[in-house]
A protein has these predicted regions:
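Predominantly a Rossmann-like dinucleotide-binding segment in NAD(P)-dependent oxidoreductases
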Residues: 1-70, 124, 207
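C-terminal glycine/acidic-rich active-site capping loop/insertion
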Residues: 16-21, 25, 58, 77, ...
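Glycine-rich phosphate/pyrophosphate-binding beta-alpha loops
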Residues: 68, 91-99
């Protein structure tokens, strides 16, 4: 079972609806077919695939526009299934007042569960079945070689979003040089994400009917 969300409340003020920095996100002429799900929710869905190593096969979506005048959704609930049959739940909202960033993920399996939140990015919480919760810290020497490679500063020091993005550019430069590129996002990731956005829109307009979320070439 995978539960993930990317929800904040920064667009929840109806009196700010005409702010150009907000308005374009819900205007199909500028944002396309989807609002909040394409803006934030798709990141949570991709994270679910990245962490589990399993691609999304199908989904069922429920979109809502809670602020009058918005043509695109500002809240999205999505159920999904992966290629290996894992059950997934996703919530993405821009009107969840009180939430600042709200990007997190939980994975529950046969032997335990884990959770990570972007607002506490240095820790992963892991609980084995029948055991105590363990906190794995960024920079800890017991982590994998890949985790160590991606840690830029010493343990207990905040890494920050810019350095996380910098890791992607480092891997991109390695790929250009022909060296091993780590877990670099690929064109396939982008194609799958776009297909999932269109599938979610298709599902939402049909009251949540289940839709194949895979691009045609991967079906």
């Amino acid at each position: 079972l995978i539960v993930t969300n990317f929800s904040h409340g920064h667009h929840g003020d109806a009196t700010d609806a005409d702010n150009p920095r907000v308005r374009w996100r819900y205007d199909p002429a500028m944002a396309g077919v989807s609002g909040q799900f394409a803006d934030c929710g798709i990141h949570a869905l991709h994270m679910a695939s990245f962490i589990s190593g399993d691609e999304v096969r199908s989904l069922s979506a429920d979109f809502a526009s809670t602020i009058p005048g918005r043509a695109l959704e500002d809240d999205a609930m999505v159920n999904f299934r992966t290629e290996r049959g894992t059950v997934g739940r996703l919530w993405s909202s821009s009107v969840a007042i009180g939430r600042q960033h709200g990007f997190d993920i939980q994975v529950f399996g046969e032997t335990g569960g884990m959770r990570w939140a972007s607002e506490q990015p240095n820790q992963v919480y892991y609980t084995p079945v029948g055991g105590r919760t363990q906190i794995m810290e960024k920079g800890d020497g017991s982590l994998s070689d890949e985790a160590t490679r991606l840690s830029r500063v010493a343990i207990a020091h905040p890494e920050g979003f810019p350095l996380a993005v910098a890791n992607i550019y480092v891997d991109l430069a390695a790929a250009i040089r022909g060296a091993p590129a780590g877990a670099l996002p690929t064109a396939e990731d982008g194609v799958r994400s776009m297909a999932a956005v269109y599938a979610a829109v298709e599902s939402a307009v049909q009251d949540g009917v289940w839709v194949d979320a895979r691009p045609p070439m991967f079906r």
